[in-house]
């Protein structure tokens, strides 16, 4: 899942924290870190949101996605 998300994000998205979590075996935290870095760098595209929603129903990844989407909607107002 991490590799699929990583592949659809632009190279400008920082991956240092995400890769650190990935190397530590913390896959979900790697994905949440990658989502956070994507949000702060380029925003969350429909492709990113769709990929996460297709693969997760609950847990830290969905919690992070929902929080970032909330902040993105507030920022857009």
Language-model regions, residue ranges each:
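C-terminal-biased regions
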Residues: 1-77
């Amino acid at each position: 899942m991490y590799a699929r998300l990583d592949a659809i994000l632009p190279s400008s998205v920082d991956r240092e924290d995400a890769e650190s979590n990935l190397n530590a075996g913390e896959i979900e935290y790697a994905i949440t870190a990658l989502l956070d870095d994507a949000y702060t760098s380029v925003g969350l595209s429909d492709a990113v949101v769709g990929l996460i929603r297709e693969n997760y129903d609950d847990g830290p990844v969905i919690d992070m996605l929902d929080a970032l989407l909330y902040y993105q909607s507030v920022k857009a107002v």
